[in-house]
Amino acid sequence: HADARQAAVARLLADVPDSVALHHDLTTAAAGTVVRTIRDATGIVSAGEAPLVNDCACCALREDLVPELRRLADAGLTRLAVVELWDSVEPKAMAEVVATGGLRLTSVITAVDPALLLPYLADGDDLAEVGLAAAATDRRTVADTFARQLEYAPVLAVVSSEQADDEDRALLAQLHPTARRVPIDALDVTDGEGRGTDWFAPARPPATGWTPPGWEADPVHTTNAAPPHGCGSPDVATSGAGAIDGAGTTADAGAGADAPGADPAAPGAGPRSERIGSGAGGTEPRSGRTGSALVDAAFAGFDVEAAAAAQHPACALLPAEADEAGVGTLVWHRRRPFHPERLYAALEDLTCAAARSRGRFWLADRPDTLLHWDAAGGALCVESAGPWLASLPDAAWDMVPPVRRAAAALDWHPEHGDCCQHLVFTSPGLDREGLELLLESCLLTDAEYAAGPAAWKRLPPAFDSLLEV
């Protein structure tokens, strides 16, 4: 949500002396340029343009971002640089660009208005249809882009909203239960020239099933850099997809206490998370000002590799079973493969059964391939995520990351290894019983299962078109 993102950035600029926000506006990409602005708490400090790279606005952003952060670092006048990402920019991609540029990230924060959650998850429009495509070849949808922005960040800056209800807060908690949630006040933010801004904010119609109530979110990055040669380096925070400290080559890179893969007892780990609101996330007392809590979160630390592992379908930290305020999460785990034709026939019903579903699944005619399930906004993405570890020779295991081996060990079965179904469905008004019956009907029958893997591979390859074979 643009307003939520701007409120989070404004709060950081107000609470951290000598801080600036770096923002690349991609709305001018059609004219061949990307507009870059740098502002502080008083307004715009400088503005410029970056040319498109290969007709791709995000490519231009990647080319321009690190040099600008380094320029701010070298000037030695900026304590915090907030990288405010544009609406459809993926925080994961930009966080990895900053990390590989020799800069250290201190956090990734997504700013959220809970009242806009469902409208975004229900919006299956292509980004191009709403003017948010980052390139001519951009085929992403509003819903799946938003879901990734939300789920990647270990910290959610939750803007206060009179329209948000218990259902909205429960949905937020169940979609990303491990996130640290920090409350922020809704500010009267402008674009630096006195104009209020609100890009792509859908109205909130009456709720029917899980479809229209709504939400919107934007990630925030912050990176903290150690001072080079005794000079102060700016920390960099990004609103839209994470907090990036881009001032120096030794920025803080630890994982926050609630970040995936983080050890709360490890040196440099962030503070324990403070929960707000009701629902599955529970409530914990808050200490200090709202602003200081957001600043603490912005400097908590961020591990790019751990964050990537937490999103990989083979070892993703998926939500757990939950039922709160009319919102439910079903975790469906089985050790029998799907029949390809029956599953393919059920895809539309399964995709529309929940506001959000994701996980990994096992197809009988592709017994060695781990498949990724990613659905939002009534659209489903299915893709190969590589082999199941059970299909690899022992010698290849040494090349598998430890986190992947650990995830496989949790699912290990004496006969099938890590091959399994692990799908998670989250939605208001979730029909658990009907969903489970539909999923069960797609599994191999006892007779089909007993025929063995050689027979499974001869089943009709219904998913070839989806997997581009």
Regions found by a protein language model. Name each.
Residues 3, 7-109, 114-122, 126-139:
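Nucleotide-state-sensitive switch-loop elements of NTP-binding domains
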Residues 81-87, 156-157, 329, 422:
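Short glycine-rich or small-residue beta-strand-to-loop segments that form or flank ligand, phosphate
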Residues 8-9, 94, 168, 342, ...:
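Hydrophobic side chains in well-ordered alpha-helices
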